[in-house]
């Protein structure tokens, strides 16, 4: 038992344990098959079901000789295309989600094997492994704690919020653990989280066989709730469907009434009357189909999928893809300093004193492995330990590690110190390490760095130390102080009358590109607040270097912030740029108050205590180097922990929303025009404005293909020159409404010209029907060029989205082929050169009208 606890498994045992007890990898959730996606495409939409019913009726009429096969065949072809696109999109999104889940669930832990600390994938844990457990880490397998003490939360498994204290088991370790052991003081369970302390555990059960294995598998299949965007889009679709249905019913009634008044049903066989009514009902149904922008769900899925891929390429893992559009609304980013604004690579710059070396070793989460490499702990822990290498003091480390530790106080960002109690020759004494102002105010003596004598810490010496610390802080050097006292530490209490041992200052340089990213944020209307655990002077120095803080801005300590009333904080919020010695509770309070003022807030975090603020923020950016708790609370994981990636993510979020809006600005004029024209047309002519087959063709072309086209629009630099999207304004701003109104007016004007002044150029119903069809196709393409840019150059950036010109050309070519070659199947007629020229000229009416709108809007 003792040997196992210290050395862990040997390499030869790992594979045999895996073969005997299985892997720790949980089974993959069952994926949808192609047949499942086909069923979804055909039977999840009531309109598609109605289309299939209509196709069967049309087929019956064709078989009985009262109709042609063109209508049911075209409906079947369109349904086939819709199904194919739905299956392709669904499978693509599913595969993207699977890969995202795989990457976001990729977690590592430290185990001891062959007597050395090794970092392994959590899936590679085997029964018998000696696993190191740390604050903020998830427990990945069932087992017993054998060293250290921890408090764990079972909330993720059973909803119980009370933390359970765990301490080492003595003697024999049972082979099995049951759920009856949740409150057992020695048992640890997969799926729970370490909220306090650290230690080691022996694994007894892995994977699906753990107590919570089935629950953990089930949690992988839970669907995310709808976001504000999807709810808004669904409401829009419902609104259009409702009014489209009303318009379809009115159009159907008008066509039947006009037919009756005109005597069309007199002396007709009942089967011919039934055929005519079915055709009119088919047109009415296709009006509903055309009115509803079915491409909306597809473009949301497509753009989300593309953004997840694009973000991953730039070190952004969108574990909650639904939050991608939320980034377009962000106007406040609250960021950590260490590792986010700075490199996180700590280099010792100042070493004041020599008496803290044993404190530095024992009061530290980092260790030297057998090869002499520093592992574990955070960047400051590792920087502290590297001092021993600089001073050639490895003997100090070896001697210190032999001493008996009887109590630990883990570092807390709230308490701002850590501690350790050591027993030597039956005497217990304690070491403390933390923020200099916290340590220094509790010290009454100090160790003379020259002679090593313990002396009174008088006002003069205290002032000298404070001056040294202040000078270091102004140079953006972060300082950590050390002290000692006889006796065992008390939990969460920093004692008085300590002996000051000295301090260390480490430098953490600004990351490359941060200054430029901060400037981009300013130009994009985004406020940046640095929230750091550093001293105020250090925080201001880094913020000034990054361009966050300027003369006239406000920088506060955590204490100053906590003493302010809510209304005062809201008043100064626009000028607030720095909060130093920041506690996690301050982060949560700032997020809450900023949201109350209407701001959309992003918060970064890496610690367990950051999780409430990350969860409360509109978008939570968790650091990849952070705890499992922080990453679980975050929406986005920054795999490089870099501030520049946040700004990049915001740019992609804005691109997402612009692409959605472009599709709506493109699609809705077509939907509205079809509704209006189908309603008005029966007053001026017999029959329908377009046949059901033609409306379905337009619908599949405009909805499905252009959702791919606009979904592929790349990010644009001008998006970061705009102000953020505003909460509560809905999907359409003033300019968007003007674009839709202008385009709808242009469509209507073109058809008025076609149907009246130019009517004599098109002979017979077949040619007129062809003209109406191809004009709509051509105008849609021209409108697409208009909505994708805000300037006069309609070809700007056209090569960056190769799908757009390809689909535009495909639509134009398809319209020509249908009109000139496939006309017989659809009741059309080929057009001559002059007729095509009229169509082309009329389709371009939208360009000067939209340019005029853009000119007026720019003023």
Where are these regions (language model features)?
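Non-transmembrane, extramembrane segments of multi-pass ion/lipid transporters
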Residues: 8-40, 104-111, 164-165, 171-172, ...
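Hydrophobic alpha-helical segments characteristic of transmembrane helices
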Residues: 24-106, 219-314, 522, 532-536, ...
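Alpha-helical transmembrane segments of multi-pass membrane proteins
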Residues: 40-63, 79-83, 106, 238-265, ...
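Cytosolic catalytic regions of P-type ion-transporting ATPases
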Residues: 105-234, 563-573
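Conserved catalytic phosphorylation-site environment of P-type ATPases
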Residues: 106-110, 284, 295-364, 613, ...
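Membrane-embedded transport module
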Residues: 226, 251, 283, 296, ...
């Amino acid at each position: 038992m003792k040997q196992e606890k210290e050395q862990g498994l040997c390499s030869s045992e790992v594979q045999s344990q895996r073969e005997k007890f299985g892997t720790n990898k949980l089974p993959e959730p069952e994926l949808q098959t192609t047949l499942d996606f086909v069923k979804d495409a055909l039977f999840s939409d009531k309109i598609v079901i109605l289309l299939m019913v209509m196709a069967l009726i049309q087929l019956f009429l064709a078989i009985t000789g009262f109709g042609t096969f063109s209508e049911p065949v075209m409906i079947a072809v369109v349904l086939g295309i819709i199904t194919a696109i739905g299956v392709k999109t669904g499978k693509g999104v599913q595969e993207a989600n699977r890969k995202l889940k795989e990457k976001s669930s990729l977690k590592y832990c430290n185990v001891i094997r062959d007597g050395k600390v090794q970092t392994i994938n959590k899936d590679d844990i085997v029964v018998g492994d000696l696993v190191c457990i740390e604050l903020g880490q998830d427990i990945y397998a069932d087992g017993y704690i054998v060293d250290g003490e921890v408090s764990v939360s079972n909330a993720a498994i059973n909803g119980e919020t009370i933390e359970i204290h765990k301490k080492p088991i003595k003697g024999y370790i049972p082979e099995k653990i049951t759920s009856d052991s949740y409150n057992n003081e020695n048992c640890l369970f997969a799926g729970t989280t370490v909220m306090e302390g650290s230690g080691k555990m022996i694994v007894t059960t892995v994977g699906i066989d753990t107590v919570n294995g089935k629950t953990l598998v089930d949690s992988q299949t839970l669907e995310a709730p709808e976001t504000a965007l999807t709810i808004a889009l669904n409401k829009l679709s419902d609104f259009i469907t409702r009014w489209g249905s009303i318009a379809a019913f009115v159009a159907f009634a008008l066509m039947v009434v006009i037919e009756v008044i005109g005597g069309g049903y007199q002396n007709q066989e009942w089967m011919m009357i039934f055929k005519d009514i079915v055709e009119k009902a088919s047109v009415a149904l296709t009006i509903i189909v055309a009115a509803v922008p079915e491409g909306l769900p597809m473009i949301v899925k497509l753009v989300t999928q593309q953004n997840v891929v694009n973000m991953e390429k730039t070190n952004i893992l969108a574990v909650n893809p639904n939050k991608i559009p939320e980034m377009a609304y962000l106007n406040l980013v609250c960021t950590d300093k260490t590792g986010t604004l700075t490199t996180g690579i700590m280099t010792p710059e100042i070493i004041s004193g020599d008496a803290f070396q044993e404190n530095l070793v024992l009061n530290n989460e980092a260790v030297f492995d057998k090869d002499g490499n520093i592992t574990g702990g955070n960047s400051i822990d590792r920087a502290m330990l590297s001092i021993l290498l600089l001073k050639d003091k490895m003997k100090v480390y070896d001697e210190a590690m032999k001493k008996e530790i009887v109590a630990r106080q883990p570092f807390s960002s709230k308490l701002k110190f850590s501690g350790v109690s050591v027993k030597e020759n039956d005497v217990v004494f304690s070491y403390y390490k933390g923020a200099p102002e916290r340590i220094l105010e509790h010290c009454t003596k100090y160790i003379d760095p020259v002679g090593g004598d313990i002396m009174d810490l008088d006002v003069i010496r205290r002032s000298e130390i404070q001056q040294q610390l202040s000078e270091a802080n102004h140079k953006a050097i972060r300082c950590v102080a050390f002290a000692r006292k006889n006796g065992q530490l008390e939990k969460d209490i920093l004692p008085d009358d300590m002996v000051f041992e000295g301090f260390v200052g480490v430098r953490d340089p600004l990351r490359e590109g941060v200054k430029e990213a901060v400037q981009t944020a300013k130009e994009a209307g985004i406020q940046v607040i640095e929230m750091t655990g550093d001293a105020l002077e250090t925080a201001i120095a880094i913020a000034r270097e990054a361009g966050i803080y300027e003369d006239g801005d406000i920088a506060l300590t955590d204490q100053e912030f906590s003493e302010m009333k809510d209304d005062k904080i809201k008043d100064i919020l626009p000028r607030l740029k720095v909060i130093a010695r920041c506690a996690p509770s301050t982060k949560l309070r700032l997020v809450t108050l900023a949201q109350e003022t209407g701001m959309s807030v992003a918060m970064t975090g890496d610690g367990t205590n950051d999780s409430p603020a990350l969860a409360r923020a509109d978008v939570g950016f968790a650091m990849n180097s952070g705890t499992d708790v922080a990453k679980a609370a975050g929406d986005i994981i920054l795999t490089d922990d870099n501030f520049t990636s946040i700004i990049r993510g915001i740019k992609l979020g804005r691109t997402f929303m612009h692409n959605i809006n472009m599709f709506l600005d493109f699609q809705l004029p077509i939907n509205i025009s079809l509704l209006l024209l189908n309603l008005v047309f029966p007053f001026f002519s017999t029959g329908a404005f377009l046949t059901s087959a033609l409306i379905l063709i337009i619908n599949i072309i405009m909805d499905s293909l252009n959702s791919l086209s606009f979904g592929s629009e790349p990010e644009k630099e001008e998006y970061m020159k705009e102000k953020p999207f505003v909460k509560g304004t809905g999907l359409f701003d003033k300019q968007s409404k003007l674009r839709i109104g202008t385009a709808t007016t242009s469509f209507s004007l073109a058809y008025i010209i076609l149907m009246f002044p130019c009517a004599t150029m098109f002979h017979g119903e077949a040619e007129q029907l062809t003209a109406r069809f191809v004009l709509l196709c051509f105008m849609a393409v021209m409108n697409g060029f208009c909505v994708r840019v805000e300037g006069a150059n309609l070809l700007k950036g056209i090569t960056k989205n190769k799908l757009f010109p390809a689909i535009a050309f495909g639509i134009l070519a398809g319209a020509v082929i249908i009109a000139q070659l496939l006309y017989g199947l659809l009741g059309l007629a080929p057009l001559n050169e002059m007729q095509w020229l009229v169509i082309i000229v009329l389709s371009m009416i939208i360009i000067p009208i939209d340019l005029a709108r853009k000119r007026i809007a720019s003023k």
